Amino acid sequence: MIRDMRATVNETVPPLTPAHRSSARVHLGPLRGIPLVLEHFGVPSEPVLTTVGLRREDFETPDRSAAFEDLDRLFGLCIRKTGCDHFGLLLSQYVSLQSFGITGRLARNATSVGAALQDLAGFFLLHDSGGSINLSIHNGSVTFGYGIHVPGIRHADQVYDLAVGGMVNVMRELCGPDWRPAVVLLPRKRPPGLRPYRERLLSPLRFDSVLAGIIFPEPVLSRPIVDADSYLHTLLAENASAALARTDPLLHADVRRAIRLLLLAQQCSRREVARHLGLHER
């Protein structure tokens, strides 16, 4: 079903200078829990948010986005204010398919889990141009992962904790509330306290991984999605495709990113790069 998958790694890179600031942005839907988590620790959210030019109501605006680097700074502020080094993990409890707007609705109405994940991967750029969803199959196991391709992100561990927790939520929406991954991959050092991770993810944990993601058996991809609406899926796919066509992804940067991802997956060729970008091979 899903054979031409990609992989990515968490690389160590120097901090960005202003001259090298990325244009990558991310929609705030998956981050709407930030004010709630801050206030859980007794930290007023508005002073923290205004530091990066945001307001609480921005997180309730579907199309509101922020620069990837600003959100990196925001994670740093949140950690300092709360003293919690698993802030991203706590934030992940608020992530759902609805967090991803049209892409999430498209996935929710796909015919199967595999088709839903393909939709998420194919249209993820509409919501996050600083990272990519990665899917691969090996020896009967699927790896569903997320990789950052913006250099200089200092709090990548928080982003990956958020992403992995969000993946578990998405899979439970598609497969049922009792679903659990076989393994959770976390590209961060093993923390002193494992309890928050065990309670939140309910699965075996693998720290110091080269990938952020979850692993589950391949047959899960064939599971049908309950109450999926095929007609609505068709309409949403047309709208999502039109929205994607209107994006200006800075082609040269996208080519470099595609080549790096495909090299890591050992699938790099002119044909694969063209397919990855939706272009003719020539």
Where are these regions (language model features)?
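Short, contiguous, pocket-lining structural segments
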Residues: 26, 40, 155, 159, ...
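Generic solvent-exposed, charged/amphipathic alpha-helical segments
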Residues: 117, 121, 164-168, 172, ...
